[in-house]
Amino acid sequence: MTLLALGINHKTAPVSLRERVSFSPDKLDQALDSLLAQPMVQGGVVLSTCNRTELYLSVEEQDNLQEALIRWLCDYHNLNEEDLRKSLYWHQDNDAVSHLMRVASGLDSLVLGEPQILGQVKKAFADSQKGHMKASELERMFQKSFSVAKRVRTETDIGASAVSVAFAACTLARQIFESLSTVTVLLVGAGETIELVARHLREHKVQKMIIANRTRERAQILADEVGAEVIALSEIDERLREADIIISSTASPLPIIGKGMVERALKSRRNQPMLLVDIAVPRDVEPEVGKLANAYLYSVDDLQSIISHNLAQRKAAAVEAETIVAQETSEFMAWLRAQSASETIREYRSQAEHVRDELTAKALAALEQGGDAQAIMQDLAWKLTNRLIHAPTKSLQQAARDGDNERLNILRDSLGLE
């Protein structure tokens, strides 16, 4: 039995190839059935995200194994083998285990240490459980990777610092406000960055969100997802006073929120502080707003400096995480080798018990026919001894004929000889 990990990711393949190799959720069961129909495959998990498609397999060793699996992948997706080979990586046993642990821990992600990948790996594993997981070693490898990812999160700072603009904006808000559950957040725009911000805020229990956008339809889709209210851009002046936090990211060529607008809002709020995070380029908030008392304005450049600092911290934490992965990989491979020995021990014991039962049955039959008990017992002991030492004796003789002293010593040790 061999463990394999093969696939492509954002580092080895462009999006034009990644999208062709991906497995859609509605076709995943069919793909797993097709994969497990391959004679060498004992168990399989398919991990398919926007940044990677990987197959994790338990297989029987055979000639041309790599070629057979690449051919299956190309046939399934109607791909040119040469195109795929240029971008494909292939990891076996120790390297496959280490790779999965690194993936689950976010060490192989586009955004170093991002937590979402662990959920994606868990879902891929759960999907494989629906009648497709047939190899206990593969199942154990995934369960181990989940505990390793948890350990990396617990024992290092790999996920402690924001390294995306959206996440950094939310982290800044959490640092300034003791609890986000009691604040009102105004989001200006409804593009990808604001979508990410809104989801982060929802995860941190923000109860009231207002989304202001040029087109109501796009904003409404996001609002329905996160439980927000939608307003027009023209309503910002009137509603700004309600917001404790304003996060803005539009494509407007001119500022949307001016100094006068914020002054009026602060007056209505009786100078309760406002946090304004402007992550738009060009800027959505007039820079002069930052000069107002109780208005705390941060630009995308401010966030980038936070991100750069945090990325350096994550890289330092990644060194610690790699040490954990190496240690856990070594422990898993030791367990795997022990499993192999356990199977050999079971076979050896079963063989010995079969010999014992066979000879005991013959001895009992002889006793029932009135044979001499002492002679029957001596015959049983002699035959049992000969049958049990026959195979080890042949191995010792062959090692001696070959002049293989190392094998002789191993056999002596195995047989408990001084």
Curated annotation (Swiss-Prot):
Q: What is its EC number?
A: 1.2.1.70
- Amino-acid positions noted as binding substrate in the UniProt annotation, renumbered to this chain: T49, C50, N51, R52, S109, E114, P115, Q116, Q120
Checking InterPro entries in the record gives: 4pyrrol_synth_GluRdtase (IPR000343), 4pyrrol_synth_GluRdtase_dimer (IPR015896), 4pyrrol_synth_GluRdtase_N (IPR015895), GluRdtase_CS (IPR018214), GluRdtase_dimer_dom_sf (IPR036453), GluRdtase_N_sf (IPR036343), NAD(P)-bd_dom_sf (IPR036291), Shikm_DH/Glu-tRNA_Rdtase (IPR006151)
Q: Where is this site: Important for activity?
A: H99
Q: Which reaction does it catalyse?
A: (S)-4-amino-5-oxopentanoate + tRNA(Glu) + NADP(+) = L-glutamyl-tRNA(Glu) + NADPH + H(+)
Query: One GO MF term, please?
Result: NADP binding
Catalytic EC class = oxidoreductase
Its annotated pathway reads: Porphyrin-containing compound metabolism; protoporphyrin-IX biosynthesis; 5-aminolevulinate from L-glutamyl-tRNA(Glu): step 1/2
Residue sites binding NADP(+) per the record? G189, A190, G191, E192, T193, I194
What are its GO biological-process terms? protoporphyrinogen IX biosynthetic process from glutamate
What UniProt keywords apply to this chain's record, in alphabetical order? NADP, Oxidoreductase, Porphyrin biosynthesis
Quote the record's miscellaneous comment. Answer: During catalysis, the active site Cys acts as a nucleophile attacking the alpha-carbonyl group of tRNA-bound glutamate with the formation of a thioester intermediate between enzyme and glutamate, and the concomitant release of tRNA(Glu). The thioester intermediate is finally reduced by direct hydride transfer from NADPH, to form the product GSA.
Q: What is stated as this protein's family in its record?
A: Belongs to the glutamyl-tRNA reductase family.
- Please state what the annotation says regarding this protein's domains: Possesses an unusual extended V-shaped dimeric structure with each monomer consisting of three distinct domains arranged along a curved 'spinal' alpha-helix. The N-terminal catalytic domain specifically recognizes the glutamate moiety of the substrate. The second domain is the NADPH-binding domain, and the third C-terminal domain is responsible for dimerization.
Protein name, per record: Glutamyl-tRNA reductase
Q: What organism is this sequence from?
A: Escherichia coli O139:H28 (strain E24377A / ETEC)
